[in-house]
C-alpha cells in the first residue's frame, strides 16, 4: 500500500490565500493616475505575488514527486518563452510586453508560477473559500458594471467602447470574466453542501452577470458562458446515466454548430450572434498564421504581433476598416503564441493545455464521488475561458483565470490519483525562514523593476496634461515632465516617443528628434517613430529625408495608401515626376471602395 501524503494545512492555507488574493487583485485592480490604468497595475500585482509564491513552492518541493510531468511541461513553456524573448529583436517588449498589453516573458513566467502553485496547494477543502471569493469578485463586478451601464461610473474614462468596461478596460474582456464567473456561480447552485443563501446568490448573481454580458454588446461573452455551462450540464447528465449524457452532448453539438453558422451569417442564430467584429478576426488569424509560416522556429518575437501586422494583413483589411487601423494581437491565444514564439512556444502552450485535459479525463474516470461535481464546475469554467481565448486577446485580467483554473484541475486530479489527504490537525508554526527567504529575494528584485515602471507610467500620465503655449513657465514645466519620461529607466519605448514628439512640438527640436532617431535605431519596425520622423522632415521641407522614412513605412505597411500618397507628394516636391507617377500607379492598383477611393481620387489630382 502506498504511503498517504499529509501536507501541512497551515502552509497550504497561507499559500492558497496568496493565490486567491492574486486572482482578486489582478481581476479588480486598476489605477487611474497611470498612462495604462488597467494592464500595467495588473501585471505588477501578478509579478509580485508570483515572486512571493516562489518561496512557498521551494518549501514544498518534496511534494512534487507525483507531479514531475506537470513541472516539466510548465518548465518547458517558461523556458520556451525565455528563449524566444532572448532572441527577440526588441528586448523591452519581449520581457515586459507591448504597450497596453504587458504580455511579455515576465508575465508568462508569473502565470506559470501561479499555475504550479494552484496545482500544488489548492484542494477540495479550499473550495468554499474559492467560491466565496468568486461571489465577492462577482458582486463587485455586478455593482460596478451596473453603474457603468447606467452611466454612473465614478471615473470619467476616455472610452471609445461600450460603457461597460468593468475593471479590465474593455467590454470584451469584462464579458469574458463575467462569463467565467457566471459559469462557476450557476454550477455551484448544485453543491448541496452550500447554504441556501449561497445557492440563492449563485442563481441571482449568474443571471445578473448574463444580463450585463448582453448589455456589454460582447457576444463572445455569451458564447463563452454557453460553452462553459453546457460542458457542466453534459458532465451532470453523464453522471445520471449514459443515455442522458449522450442526448445532452448531441444537443450541445447541434447548438454549437448553429452558433458557429450564426456567427458566419448563416441560419436562425445570425441576428443574435453575428457582429462585424467576428469577420475582422479572420484577418487577424490569417496574418498570425502567415507570420508563423515565415518564422516557424522562434516566431516574430515575444508580444511583437502589432509590429508585424500591417506587413502581413491582407489588402482587403485597410480597404474595409481604414488605412490607419491596426491590431496588436491575433485574437486567438494559440495563433498568437505560434506567431510570436514559433513552434517552440506554440507547442509548449498546446502541450500544457492537453495535459490539463488529460488530468480532467483521468479524474472523471477515477472519481464518481461528491467532489466530481465541484471538479466539473471548475472544468466548465476553464472551458469557458478557452472558448473566449479562441476569439480574443490574452488579457492578464482574463488569463489569470485560465492559469489558476487549469492548475487547480491538474492538482486535484494528481492528488486524487496519489491518494493525497490533508492532515487532521494543523501544526502551529513559527515563521518559516527558508520560505520567507526564497520569497523575499525574488520579490525584492521584482519590486525594484516595478518601482521604475510605476514612475514611467505616472510620469507619462502627467506628461499628457495640457499646457498654456503663451505662458513660458507652463511650457517649461511641460518640457521638464517630457524629459523625465524620456529618462526614466525601463520606460516603454512608445511613451518615450510620445514625449519626444511633445518636445519637438514645444521647440526643443534637437532633443526630441534625437530621441525618436534613437527609438528608430533600436526598433526599425516601430512605425509610429517612422511616421514622426517623416512628418517632421516634411514640415521643414527636407523631402529627401522624409522619403527615406516613407519608403521604410512602405515596406512595413505596403497597403497604406495614405503613406503612399504622401510619399508620392514628396517625390513630386523634389521634381521626380517619374517616381510620383509610379506611386500613383501603385495606389491605383488596389485603393478602391469607401476608404480607398477618396485616396485614389486625391492621388490622381496631386501626383499625375
PLM regions and their residue ranges:
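Interfacial juxtamembrane loops and adjacent helix segments
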Residues: 148, 153-165, 275-278, 290-291, ...
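Helix-loop-helix junctions and helix-breaking kinks within/between transmembrane helices
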Residues: 36-42, 145, 169-172, 203-235, ...
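A membrane-periplasm/extracellular boundary helix in multi-pass inner-membrane enzymes
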Residues: 124, 148-152, 211-216, 221-225, ...
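Hydrophobic alpha-helical transmembrane segments
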Residues: 78-88, 126-157, 169, 210-216
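Transmembrane signal-anchor hairpin modules in multi-pass inner-membrane enzymes, especially those
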Residues: 1-103, 111-136, 188-203, 230-253, ...
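TPR alpha-solenoid repeat register
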Residues: 495, 529, 563, 596-598
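Transmembrane alpha-helices of multi-pass inner-membrane enzymes
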Residues: 23-27, 46-54, 224, 228-232, ...
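A conserved mid-to-late transmembrane alpha helix and its immediate loop/hinge
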Residues: 170, 210, 289, 319-358
